[in-house]
Amino acid sequence: MMDKHEQGISMKIGNNRPLHGSVLAGVVGVLVLAGCQRQGEPAPATDAAPAAETAAVDPAPAAEAPLDLRDVIENNEREVVGISYPAGIDRYPGLARALQGYATSARSDLQQALDGLGNDKPTMPYELSLSFEKLLETPQLVVVSADGSRYTGGAHGEPLVARFVWLPQQQQMLSAEKLVPDAKGWKAISDFVAEQLRERVATRLSGEDMDPAQLQESLRNASRMIADGTGPQADNFSQFQPLTDDKGQITALRFVFPPYQVGPYSDGTQTADVPAAVVLPHVAKDYVELFARG
């Protein structure tokens, strides 16, 4: 049974802080330097050889393995797996590898849960549902979302929520830590987001039929979860997506919070938009030109 979770999700899995996260991607390069002397055989005394003759030559870096971003559909009595990738994303190999790494990690966790059953069969098939979607593509920015769930027993699946912000010109991922490098910036963002989320939950709860004491208790509980999940650290805001104008410049950042981070599971994935005017004074100088001004 595949659940479809609400749209909007950086790298966090279930109740844990970022898999997001974070995302596993990379290639191991092995450098081997040869040249050893036989044991037990004294080396003859010779004049020092010219540097050109004795300098070891580093081998060329190992070639990266080719990408294989094919959609996955598997269905048997023990597991149901569905993974889909956006078309053409292999144009950006570094980004594609990050997506592949995230999916591989999620699949590995599912397999680990299945291995824990031994020869037993789960009462319901374990499930991994993961969809990558390209949200934005400009010469400066490519943004991909990952949304889905992993079910390994219990009342419901673990939400899978991540955002990937790729800078094609720099060939690198843009992380929250790089974008806003100082504590003062995260304090400003934290205050703005927390207030927005508190106002939203207050509006929702005030429309429900509950007595004043119950309403106040619900508001206190909600405020406590929001405060815990929006503390002024980059880790709490690791999942974000830029919103841009028609020129491709960033006008706001949409921060994405999976279930349990700022509210109960029943509230689903939540988002908060922070305008460029709030963020820009704290953005690292290397990324200021990505933002709209005025």
Predicted features and spans:
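Bacterial N-terminal signal peptides that target proteins for export
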Residues: 6-25
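C-terminal motif of bacterial Sec signal peptides marking the signal peptidase cleavage site
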Residues: 33-35
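Compositionally biased intrinsically disordered regions enriched in Thr/Gly
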Residues: 37-294
